[in-house]
Amino acid sequence: MIKLLLALFTIFTLVHAQPSSKALNSSLEAIGIEESYEEIRALDGIRDKYATSYKSHMKRYKATQEDHATIAKKFEEANVPLFFSLIPYCESNFRSDIRGHGTAGLWQFMAQSGRTYGLTIKKGNDERTDICRSTDAAILYIKDLKKEFGSWYLADFAYGMGEIKLKRLIKKNGSNKISVLLKDPAFPRGTKDHFGKTLLLDATIHQSKSEE
């Protein structure tokens, strides 16, 4: 009974806790961002802004930890920050069966992108909905974006908005610093939301592990 109560308390704390600035800075550093959370004005108030969706993602994370551990191991073995293993919670609510406008699976691959990274996509066999195969493809794609843009956080931005749009933003601003890019009105809201939510999730999970 005591163990059950402790487990329930841990789940409640993880779902309702908000990450500290220290935890957020650790997550930012892990994806190559040299500026601190406090210095990035565009991130002001994200804990309150995304409070509702953040709690929903945390509940989903607790319900899918076993499956997440499987893909997290793949990211670790590929030397890709674990931040990226949390993208599916914001992309698809960690559901492999979900479909969007031409997209499908945990990683919401378009058919063309999926095929480029080795996925079979045909009637009766769409590997975008296969957790392991689609994750392998996502890792290859993210690593290619890292090679192209030189940093992990830019790889995340490119994943969200596309390579061409990110290149235009960098050229327009004459900088690839996150504090500069995020304050540009042309920075896609969807990509900014995706980044903020994933950052909160990553920071909270690492904070909870450090407190164990």
Question: What is each PLM-predicted segment?
Answer:
Residues 16-79:
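An acidic, Gly/Ser/Thr/Pro-rich helix-cap/linker signature
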Residues 210-212:
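Low-complexity, Gly/Ser/Thr/Pro-rich intrinsically disordered linker/tail segments
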Residues 80-95, 155-160, 198:
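Short, functionally critical alpha-helical segments immediately adjacent to catalytic or ligand/cofactor-binding
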Residues 97-102, 168-172:
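Short, solvent-exposed loop/turn and secondary-structure capping segments
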Residues 4-13:
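Sec-dependent N-terminal signal peptides
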Residues 102-123, 135-137, 142:
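Substrate-binding/active-site groove segments that recognize
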Residues 142-173:
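Catalytic and binding regions of secreted/periplasmic enzymes and modules that target cell-wall glycans
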Residues 57-68, 77-80, 99-107, 127-135, ...:
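Solvent-exposed, acidic/flexible segments
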